[in-house]
């Protein structure tokens, strides 16, 4: 059985995090690529051992909450046997997000093969197990959706055969052949580890701006950036839906398994894309998914809140429910139970924060 460590709170399966509501494990799906059957299997594990719901993350992964501490060996075995733990040494550094609609709609190239190569190379390099667990790779198919987020290293396609390697932001990059992109991203990750140790074990490439500017071939860029939200509804024959507050219930997981034609993409905005399932949108909406960008649920997110988190002073999800049921049009809004603002969305949004020193005060901030 695996116990909880407090040295690093970014959880994995073998390194859970202990929250107020029990242990939390996180499963990475590089590029958000999974299947309806996989989500159904994880839902069954969550029902057997934890709270029952699956929590989608802003890095296109899945968390199981409310688990016993230590986490049962049977849970770990089930996750391993399902293929969700391909590298026990690297599980917490397999943080790769990609353009969710790549190969479905828009974009210049299908980047899924690059994501697979990057993940395989990452897991094959022993030194890269030492990357900070918050270190993030992004792979953009050229539409500018994920390269506008906060990240550490990235690739953005220019055409089918070329792209930019991005260092810490979309304004610094190196022109590379697409066929070399995975190897060069991994080489830069190794160089970052060396540079970060010399600088006092920093966590992110953005903290080493002077190092980034000295990388051979680096240039200042002015790339156009798009919204980070994935369009909802029928998109390129796919069904694109938002999962309210990122919580996938057992019934919803069963609906996804029944309606998905195989592949499912978890989006960084805590939604799901089901290729080839545009005709099944009525069933998905009936199950509680959102396919309309004018719905309040498409604009509201929240941290897990009380009582699940001891730092939170309010039940953020209950507050989000009241906001959504008000029927008012809302700007992109994130509700946080403390100043840490866990789970805040990428891009411009308003924060509603309960400062820890003033439990009755709700503060709105434009971010």
Segment roles from a protein language model:
Residues 2-3, 22-165, 171, 176-179, ...:
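Small-residue-enriched alpha-helical segments and adjacent helix-cap loops
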Residues 3-18, 291:
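Intrinsic, low-complexity N-terminal interaction/targeting segments
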Residues 156-229, 254:
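An acidic, glycine-/histidine-flanked metal-binding catalytic module
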């Amino acid at each position: 059985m695996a116990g909880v460590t407090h040295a690093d709170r970014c959880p994995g399966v073998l390194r859970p995090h202990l929250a107020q509501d029990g242990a939390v494990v996180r499963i990475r799906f590089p590029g958000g690529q999974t299947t309806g059957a996989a989500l159904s299997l994880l839902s069954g594990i969550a029902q057997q051992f934890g709270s029952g719901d699956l929590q989608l993350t802003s890095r296109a992964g899945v968390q199981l909450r409310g688990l016993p501490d230590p986490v049962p060996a049977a849970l770990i075995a089930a996750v391993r046997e399902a293929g969700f733990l391909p590298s026990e040494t690297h599980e917490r550094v397999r943080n790769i997000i990609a353009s969710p609609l790549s190969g479905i709609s828009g974009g210049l190239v299908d980047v899924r093969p690059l994501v697979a190569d990057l993940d395989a190379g990452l897991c094959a390099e022993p030194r890269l197990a030492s990357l900070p667990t918050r270190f993030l790779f992004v792979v953009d198919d050229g539409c500018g959706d994920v390269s506008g987020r906060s990240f550490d290293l990235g690739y953005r396609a220019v055409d089918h055969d070329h792209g930019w390697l991005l260092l810490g932001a979309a304004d610094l990059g190196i022109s590379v052949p697409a066929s070399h992109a995975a190897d060069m991203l991994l080489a830069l990750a190794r160089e970052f580890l060396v540079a970060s140790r010399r600088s006092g074990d920093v966590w992110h490439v953005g903290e080493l701006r002077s190092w980034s500017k000295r990388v051979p071939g680096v240039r200042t860029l002015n790339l156009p950036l798009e919204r980070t939200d994935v369009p909802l509804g029928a998109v390129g024959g796919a069904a694109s839906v938002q999962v309210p507050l990122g919580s996938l219930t057992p019934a919803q997981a069963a609906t996804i398994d029944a309606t998905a034609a195989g592949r499912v993409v978890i989006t960084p905005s805590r939604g799901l894309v089901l290729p080839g399932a545009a005709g099944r949108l009525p069933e998905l909406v009936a199950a509680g998914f959102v396919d309309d960008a004018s719905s309040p649920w498409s604009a509201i997110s929240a941290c897990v809140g009380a009582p699940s988190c001891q730092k939170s002073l309010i039940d953020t999800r209950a507050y989000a429910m009241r906001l959504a049921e008000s029927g008012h049009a809302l700007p992109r809004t994130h509700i946080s139970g403390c100043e840490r603002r866990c789970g805040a969305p990428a891009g411009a949004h308003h924060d509603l924060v309960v400062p820890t020193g003033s439990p009755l005060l709700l503060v709105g901030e434009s971010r």
